Amino acid sequence: MGYFYDTTEKILIEQYVSEHMGEIKSKITEEAVFEAGIDLLIAEPTPERPFRSLVTCGMGAIPLELPQYLSMHRINRAELVLHLSPEWQLKSRLDWPIRLMHWLSRLPLDDASLIRDLAIFELDAFLEHDNPYRAVMLHYCNECHLLDPFVRLPRKDRVIFMELIPLLPAELDYIEAHSAEEFLRDVHRFLPLAADQTRQPVTKQLSGE
């Protein structure tokens, strides 16, 4: 049994991304499709959103075990969003953001409960010379919730979008010393946080450094 969007569902996701995140200039189509077909959409920066966004299109075909306050409204599917600095040019399918998105988006095939708010995934397998981050934290897409909280599929299920918040070592230390909830509350005014080679830990601003 496989999990796949039909053409109409793909169009609905792409329309949502184009409207709320930026024009889709390119798409990375998955080469080997087995249990699920998950493409990556690249939304270009806009004046209102000065970063490039990498968005999955296909993970939402996999039903998730989301909290009851979501599932009771038939919100039981999700797509992932990773923001990148506008200067970031994705040159290869082997670039760590692309490999990371493909890896995370397939986790629900083994465990439908892994994709959840405030879940943290360490990036040991994705550490490279151009990757200063040590983990990512999932969070319900704040800007999406303010604008339009979900995509309604023809099958009646609803798809939400979850941001990947890239965590620098100091930020991961802050979470381990406090909690993911406290970190998110303290840095909320800085969201969304994009993957940026020059970004300094937001915890520096919290501590007044």
Q: What are the roles of these predicted feature ranges?
A:
Residues 1-67, 71-75, 81-209:
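Acidic, proline/glycine-rich low-complexity IDRs
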